[in-house]
Amino acid sequence: MILDNIEKSDGPVFIFSSYVWGGLVPIILALEMNGYRPYKSNNEPYLNNKYKSSDYKGDYVVKSGSLKSAHINTYVSKKQNMVNENVKVFLGTETAAEGLNLYGYREVHVLEPHFNFSLTEQVIGRCIRNESHISLPIHKRNVAVYLYASTIG
């Protein structure tokens, strides 16, 4: 479902999780299996080549305290020009919840609820900034927010 939403999105997507190994890494593996690759990185991908898709769909960027992502500062400094890059997915943990401005992003996915809703509002606010969508046509100046929850049963 998350991957379907990413592929249907008409612009870049921000995915937030409080968990690295139980939240972001499984998403990264799914992205690499489906044709996404790390942004301008010479680092080893997370997946072995035999499991990766050969169809290129875009790049992803990770901002986390424990996962290293090359060129994160280069990408973030592009500001309004972010929409001209091949980055389709930006993944982040709490380190990306404050002090980060994402321009032209069309979707926010919050993978798990947080007991403090102000953190969730901070995450959503990374993509909804003053004039952050000014370079887009008027009909594309919106942000869809997905809040996921899990149930037992």
Regions found by a protein language model. Give the residues of each.
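Short, solvent-exposed loop/turn segments at secondary-structure junctions
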Residues: G11, S18-G23, N34, S66-K68, ...
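Phosphate/pyrophosphate-binding and catalytic-coupling "lid/hinge/switch" segments at subdomain interfaces
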Residues: R141-G153
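Conserved SF2 helicase motif VI
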Residues: N116-I138, V145
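A short beta-strand element within the Helicase C-terminal
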Residues: N101-P113, A144-L147
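Conserved helicase ATPase core of P-loop NTP-dependent helicases/translocases
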Residues: S41-E94
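Conserved helicase/translocase motor-coupling segment
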Residues: M1-A30
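Conserved helix-turn-beta segment of the N-terminal RecA-like "Helicase ATP-binding" lobe
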Residues: A30-P38
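A short acidic (Asp/Glu
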Residues: G23-L31, L100-Y105, L119-I124
